[in-house]
UniProtKB/Swiss-Prot annotation:
Gene3D superfamilies: Glutamate Dehydrogenase, chain A, domain 3, Leucine Dehydrogenase, chain A, domain 1, NAD(P)-binding Rossmann-like Domain
UniProt catalytic activity: L-glutamate + NADP(+) + H2O = 2-oxoglutarate + NH4(+) + NADPH + H(+)
Cleavable signal peptide: none
Top-rank taxon, per record: Bacteria
Protein name, entry field: NADP-specific glutamate dehydrogenase
Annotated GO CC locations: cytoplasm; cytosol
UniProt enzyme class: oxidoreductase
PANTHER family from the UniProt entry: NADP-SPECIFIC GLUTAMATE DEHYDROGENASE 1-RELATED (PTHR43571:SF1)
Matches recorded under InterPro entries: Aminoacid_DH-like_N_sf, Glu/Leu/Phe/Val/Trp_DH, Glu/Leu/Phe/Val/Trp_DH_C, Glu/Leu/Phe/Val/Trp_DH_dimer, Glu/Leu/Phe/Val_DH_AS, Glu_DH, Glu_Leu_Phe_Val_DH, NAD(P)-bd_dom_sf
GO BP: glutamate biosynthetic process
CDD domains reported for this sequence: NAD_bind_2_Glu_DH
Length: 448
């Protein structure tokens, strides 16, 4: 009854925040076995407190475009929970950004950061600004205007933002530069920085590498591996590119990539150098890959199956959704399973619909939910914070080894929790309960 009461209250209070509802529903319904066995969480109103952000900040961002016209966007930062450490989570610049999207991401971040073993609370922020089609100077002016409002709410031990969709190293650089001018301090207030001013080696690789490490841990328990296996990857940003890179390093065969216009299937395996050239150097579209590689086929989004994504209709052993939320529908899940897919590891945040997740759990495949499988990115952000605090940078090998260790620990924690609650293949339950228990314990200890 406790969970049902919370969900009804949430629906009544925020009727139009569907992404936030989806994230909360997925998380707290899997907490039922814990909540039924321990009534102290209800006594301390932990769910009520957990789903309500500690602070929501919304602000106007005014900036000048290249024609000297004033443009107005909306910025926000949702500081969700700081029970186990300073707020930590990315900034997203995309037209789809609204309160519901940022709250869903912030809520997910709380549980994800709890799993990392590091002292980080959860937050998320961003703007409906679209960097696509903007000049370098326009992006710089927007970032500076955005930081003019945000700077008073963040700090190295208060709230440490990072990048997300639309916010890469370039944008972080402009944001950091403006923060430094405003406060006259050089401190680790942002992660994802360039290597010349406090960034960490292995940061851009971290989410993709970590996702593959987590998938390997899941498969190892079943006496299997990714070596020699065909893998489907969606997206073509940092997460997808470095998922593909790590898959190639361990001898797997990734055959797909995508962007908002369509997807490519390369039967010979993805040419990583060409993909990086198109996406990281030219900032081009994925269809350019098919124009240059005869072994590749391009499918535009208008030719995708109705209610589905063509990436997931390519037969594969393992799937790595690495683009955006709700990119993998129930139709896609059925297709993956009927084509013999044995492993799904989520590089993106909430890429699978709740119905799709239900099918994966029912089929008892190796399913790594995003808050566990993609926690490598924020883990290395935490390691970047540690390097900034000590003023001592670490080598790529040291950071990668620490990342690998963290992903192993996350898997161990999630797997042991699932076994504790008599559902050993349910890593959704394992991840949510493991993440929740740590945060809830800290909240109870700190009082109301």
């Amino acid at each position: 009854m406790y969970v049902e009461k919370i969900l009804q209250s949430l629906q009544k209070k925020y009727p139009y925040q569907k992404e936030f509802h989806q994230a909360v529903y997925e998380a707290i319904t899997s907490l039922k076995p814990l909540l039924d066995s321990d009534k102290s969480y209800e006594k301390h109103a932990i769910l009520e407190r957990l789903i309500e952000p500690e602070r929501e900040i919304f602000f106007r961002v005014c900036w000048l475009d290249d024609n000297n016209q004033i443009q107005v966007n909306r910025g926000c930062r949702v500081e969700f929970n700081s029970a186990i450490g300073p707020y930590k989570g990315g900034l997203r610049f995309h037209p789809s950004v609204n309160e519901s999207v940022i709250k869903f991401l912030g809520f997910e971040q709380v549980l994800k950061n709890s799993l990392t073993t590091l002292a980080m609370g959860g937050a998320k922020g961003g703007s409906d600004f679209d960097p696509k089609g903007k000049s370098e100077h326009e992006i710089m002016r927007f970032c500076q205007a955005f930081m003019n409002e945000l700077y008073r709410h963040i700090g190295a031990t208060t709230d440490v933002p990072a990048g997300d969709i639309g916010v890469g190293e370039r944008e972080i650089g402009y944001l950091f530069g403006q923060y430094k001018k405003l406060v006259n301090r050089f401190e680790g207030v942002l992660t994802g920085k360039g290597l010349t001013y406090g960034g960490s080696l292995c940061r851009k690789e971290a989410t993709g590498y970590g996702c593959v490490y987590f998938a390997e841990e899941m498969l190892q328990e079943r006496n299997s591996s990714l070596e020699g296996k065909v893998c489907s990857v969606s997206g073509s940003g940092n997460v997808a590119i470095y998922t593909i890179e790590k898959l190639l390093q361990i001898g797997a065969k990734p055959v797909t990539a995508s962007d908002s216009n369509g997807m490519i299937y390369d039967k010979d395996g993805i040419d990583l150098e060409l993909l990086k050239e198109i996406k990281e150097v030219r900032r081009g579209r994925i269809k350019e890959y098919a124009l240059e590689k005869k072994s590749a086929e391009y499918t535009p989004t208008e030719n995708y199956p109705k209610g589905g994504n063509a990436v997931w209709h390519v037969p594969c052993f393992a799937a790595f959704p690495s683009a955006t939320e709700n990119e993998l529908s129930v139709l896609d899940a059925k297709t993956l399973l009927s084509n013999g897919c044995k492993c799904v590891a989520e590089g993106a945040n909430m890429p699978s619909s709740n119905e799709a997740i239900g099918l994966f759990l029912q089929a008892k495949i190796s399913y790594g939910i995003g808050k566990a499988a993609n926690a490598g990115g924020v883990s290395v952000s935490g390691l970047e914070m540690a390097q900034n605090a000590s003023m001592h940078p670490w080598s790529f090998e040291v950071v990668d080894a620490k990342l690998h260790h963290i992903m192993k620990e996350i898997y161990k924690n999630v797997s042991q929790t699932a076994k504790e609650f008599k559902d050993p293949t349910n890593f959704v339950l394992g991840a949510n309960i493991a993440g929740f228990r740590k945060v809830a314990s800290a909240m109870i200890a700190q009082g109301v």
